[in-house]
């Protein structure tokens, strides 16, 4: 959008910009069905008035807001040129990224269009891609480092994106197999106390990983890949004593590892392998007196070459928008009441705020 002089000079401190939508894009793709995308922009910038006439869009009002509106439409056009449609969620996230850059909350090195058009994996008619700046940086870190920690609240996509990168690496023959693991902490990994076969015992704890796999691969191919050992889904206890070469390894729910388990897992790394460790340090379900390996490892490995820590926040939640506000509300409550994981500090570390 470019600034255009008009006969109606804006008041002092205000500005006006005008934008022409290229002929190859219909106004519906830019404004949304029933002007749904336009309403998102208007709600985000109450200090400006936006007018549409034919294929011309103009904005008048607060100079800062008008400048941001111009950038929003510019970013939208860049996304549309790739053939990717704009959604209300994408517009909201574009606005949030631009405002964060304007307020100095981010360095602005990546634009919304760069974030929203970075495709990781296309499967079953849908494309998996990052939706926030922190998610993009997390995905980029996985490409650039051997060991990456994705730490953040439920719903930030840390496990899902890691699994998409694992499938991408397998399909491009960067690795020969995928290994997915998580601690079965709810049973204390004492699975012998549970009824049923071994598969029946461990399946409830590993089911979220299976669900993600079904989103990314042909469901009919998964049993074949697992039977061949190309994909392995197993409890953390089954990693002991192994060296994992030519593999993309993901440890999920890492906040529920002990320091000893975390060290054991990290030292399974073999040649030509990559490790991604995900977890939420506010959801620790370990028994009394047991430290979280995910908390401790940050103090030990932060700054080590080829190891990266990506931290996501409520702003990166990609579930229902209410989830982000719920995460913030719990964090404020814990801070105000001096609690941790839903219990008084120093108390039992179970009963956290559960969900992923």
Where are these regions (language model features)?
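A short linear hydrophobic-aromatic micro-motif
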Residues: 46-50, 309-310
């Amino acid at each position: 959008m470019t600034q255009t002089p008009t006969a109606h000079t804006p008041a002092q401190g205000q500005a006006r910009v005008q934008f022409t939508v290229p002929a190859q894009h219909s106004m519906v793709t830019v404004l949304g069905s029933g002007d749904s995308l336009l309403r998102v922009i208007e709600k985000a910038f109450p200090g400006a008035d936006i007018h549409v006439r034919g294929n011309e869009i103009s904005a008048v009002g607060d100079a800062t807001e008008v400048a941001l509106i111009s950038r929003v439409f510019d970013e939208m056009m860049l996304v549309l040129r790739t053939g990717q449609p704009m959604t209300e969620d994408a517009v909201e996230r574009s606005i949030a990224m631009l405002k964060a850059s304007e307020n100095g909350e981010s360095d602005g090195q990546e634009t919304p269009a760069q974030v929203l058009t970075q495709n990781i994996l296309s499967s079953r008619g849908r494309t998996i891609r990052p939706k926030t700046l922190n998610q993009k940086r997390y995905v980029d870190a996985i490409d650039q480092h051997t060991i990456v920690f994705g730490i953040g609240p439920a719903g930030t996509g840390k496990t899902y994106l890691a699994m998409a990168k694992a499938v991408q690496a397998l399909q491009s023959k960067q690795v020969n197999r995928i290994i997915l693991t998580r601690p079965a902490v709810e049973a204390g990994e004492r699975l012998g106390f549970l009824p049923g076969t071994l598969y029946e015992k461990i399946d409830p704890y590993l089911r979220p990983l299976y669900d993600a796999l079904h989103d990314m691969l042909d469901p009919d191919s998964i049993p074949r890949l697992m039977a061949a050992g190309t994909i392995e889904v197993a409890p953390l206890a089954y990693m002991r004593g192994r060296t994992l070469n030519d593999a993309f390894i993901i440890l999920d729910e890492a906040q529920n590892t002990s320091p000893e388990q975390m060290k054991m897992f990290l030292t399974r790394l073999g040649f030509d392998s990559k490790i991604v460790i995900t977890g939420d340090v506010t959801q620790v379900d370990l028994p009394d007196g047991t430290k979280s390996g995910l908390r401790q490892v940050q103090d030990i490995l932060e700054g080590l070459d080829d190891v990266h820590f990506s931290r996501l926040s409520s702003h990166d939640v990609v579930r229902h928008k209410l989830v982000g506000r719920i995460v913030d509300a719990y964090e404020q409550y814990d801070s105000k009441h001096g609690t941790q994981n839903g219990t008084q500090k120093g108390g039992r570390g179970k009963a956290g705020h559960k969900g992923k």
